[in-house]
Amino acid sequence: MKNNDSKISKYISLILRHKPEEIGLKLDEHGYLVVLDLIEGINKSYEGFSMDDLERIVREDSKGRYSFNEDKSKIRANQGHSIKVDLGLEEIKPPKVLYHGTGRKYLESILKNGLIKKERQYIHLSKDRETASIVGKRHGDLVILEVDSESMFNDGIKFYLSKNNVWLCNYVPKKYIKELNLEEVF
């Protein structure tokens, strides 16, 4: 099953973040699916998929997208949901600045309206420019935004930290955003 891991990982991401109904399932209130049900559902498209395959995909996922509960009977995505789930995250004070990588085609709208979560449950922010760069390159011509997270927090905006170290918030008003000059960054 190893040669299909990338495809299956994307499929798992789709199921756990957006469309569990693709395999006839529904996430619980905390975003979990029963592992055996997920494996059975995946087998409808990828015959022979097993618990060993799932554990390997979770373990080898460089972005740390998924986590099991303690006894590995349930699994969920750590963030990125378009479905409302309670991840049990607690408010936490962020570092002074965070970063958001995006494509130049979105810059005008962001500078006018701020960062809006759209179909996602939260805005995703990175603790460093390198991670923001990796994320942003997926959206075309790279732009890295610096977010004054300390001022946001001091002004009452809540921040959360996902299990895989992605900073989350509901909205980033435009006054806290600054475009970085990439020549100075790298």
Curated annotation (Swiss-Prot):
<dbReference type="InterPro" id="IPR002745">
    <property type="entry name" value="Ptrans_KptA/Tpt1"/>
</dbReference>
<dbReference type="GO" id="GO:0003950">
    <property type="term" value="F:NAD+ poly-ADP-ribosyltransferase activity"/>
</dbReference>
<keyword id="KW-0808">Transferase</keyword>
<dbReference type="InterPro" id="IPR042081">
    <property type="entry name" value="RNA_2'-PTrans_C"/>
</dbReference>
<protein>
    <recommendedName>
        <fullName>Probable RNA 2'-phosphotransferase</fullName>
        <ecNumber>2.7.1.-</ecNumber>
    </recommendedName>
</protein>
<dbReference type="InterPro" id="IPR022928">
    <property type="entry name" value="RNA_2'-PTrans_KptA"/>
</dbReference>
<dbReference type="InterPro" id="IPR042080">
    <property type="entry name" value="RNA_2'-PTrans_N"/>
</dbReference>
<dbReference type="GO" id="GO:0006388">
    <property type="term" value="P:tRNA splicing, via endonucleolytic cleavage and ligation"/>
</dbReference>
<dbReference type="Pfam" id="PF01885">
    <property type="entry name" value="PTS_2-RNA"/>
</dbReference>
<comment type="similarity">
    <text>Belongs to the KptA/TPT1 family.</text>
</comment>
<comment type="function">
    <text>Removes the 2'-phosphate from RNA via an intermediate in which the phosphate is ADP-ribosylated by NAD followed by a presumed transesterification to release the RNA and generate ADP-ribose 1''-2''-cyclic phosphate (APPR&gt;P). May function as an ADP-ribosylase.</text>
</comment>
<dbReference type="GO" id="GO:0000215">
    <property type="term" value="F:tRNA 2'-phosphotransferase activity"/>
</dbReference>
<keyword id="KW-0520">NAD</keyword>
